[in-house]
Amino acid sequence: MGKRYFCDYCDRSFQDNLHNRKKHLNGLQHLKAKKVWYDMFRDAAAILLDEQNKRPCRKFLLTGQCDFGSNCRFSHMSEQDLQELSVQVEEERRAREWPLETAELPEGHLEDWLEKRAKRLSSAPSSRAEPIRTTVFQYPVGWPPMQELPPSLRAPPPGGWSVLSKVQWG
């Protein structure tokens, strides 16, 4: 059995040979599915420009649905939809032009914050007055005894590892 080609746009597969693939890629269903896929990623400005240049779809206005769907040559948007879309386009344009105005910046500067933090820490009761609790290291349940573990899995000694100055590797 030969290889199969799976088309992500159409969500279907077929035997992969030059004739079948070319026939599928030039087919109306594939072209429509591909257009729908790429239309999902269009920005509001491009959609608004296209919809403003189209006349209203008579069948969509009368029945509320159109057989052509997103491939219709006419617009399925009402005047209110177009107005909302133009407001969205304007908001996106403003956000690109003035990114600092829309972003919430904290008031004050880093120096002010550091001063406040230093005052808060100095006025707060010292947490160092409390005795430091040392956690006792325990091996996980089910592990073999410490003597049987390789050195990489053993806990370090209480004083840490000794540093040897003249160590030769290799």
UniProtKB/Swiss-Prot annotation:
UniProt xrefs under PROSITE patterns: ZF_C3H1
Pfam families found in the cross-reference section: zf-CCCH, zf-U1
Record-annotated disulphide pairs: none
Localization in the cell: Nucleus
GO-annotated molecular function: zinc ion binding
Biological-process GO terms, alphabetical: mRNA processing; RNA splicing
Major localization class: nucleus
Domain of life: Eukaryota
UniProt-listed InterPro entries: U1-CZ_Znf_C2H2, Znf_C2H2_sf, Znf_CCCH, Znf_CCCH_sf
Gene3D superfamilies (UniProt xref): Classic Zinc Finger (3.30.160.60), Zinc finger, CCCH-type (4.10.1000.10)
Gene Ontology CC terms: nucleoplasm; U12-type spliceosomal complex
Coiled coil location: none
Keyword terms, alphabetized: Metal-binding, mRNA processing, mRNA splicing, Nucleus, Spliceosome, Zinc, Zinc-finger
Zinc finger (C3H1-type) boundaries: 51-79
Subunit-level organization: Component of the U11/U12 snRNPs that are part of the U12-type spliceosome. Not found in the major spliceosome.
Name by which UniProt lists this protein: Zinc finger matrin-type protein 5
Organism: Mus musculus
Name of the gene encoding the protein in the UniProt record: Zmat5
